[in-house]
């Protein structure tokens, strides 16, 4: 079963994952479809179902529980018409095996070609799980080479208003931005961002530099994700 929740601004991963659910014939339930029309119409106050911009409170979880229960009730009511014979799970994969042999690299696993502003250090959010970070409080720059199919970054979002925006370039082309600012949010946390996805492994030159116009400069890279 796939259960799709929602952020206060309406963001949901329904559009991202619904094709996977359809391909494997999985049940899909949308909390967004239940609450967002009511929030948009003003008949439901977001603060009644969430203490922040994303996490359900007790009332929010109650609604989710009702959504799941109603679906399960519909299944129980139709048991006589459901074929419960064993079926081999031999459905062809919907996507390529992009993340086979995936790994998370720390700062000490990278040999920079160029580096300034970044230092190797830890963090206070995941000090034991991810102790090997690239950290900058000033204007950091990092350049390294790697060979991979897919590339992403695991970095720290911060509520102190100091989180900077850093552009990521692959082979000279900007592929994404790491935005570490989460001012006013519920707390510091690790954010993942995919930068590159491909079926074939190739050598790449990766650069991380402060985005134009970013007045904040702090960034902690918790890990570099590759496959």
Where are these regions (language model features)?
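Hydrophobic transmembrane alpha-helix bundles
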Residues: 3-4, 34-47, 115-128
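Structural beta-sheet core signal
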Residues: 1-4, 153
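Conserved catalytic region of serine esterases and O-acyltransferases that act on ester linkages
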Residues: 66-227
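Catalytic His-Asp segment of secreted/periplasmic serine-dependent ester chemistry enzymes
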Residues: 7-103
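Generic low-polarity alpha-helical segments
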Residues: 2-3, 11, 202
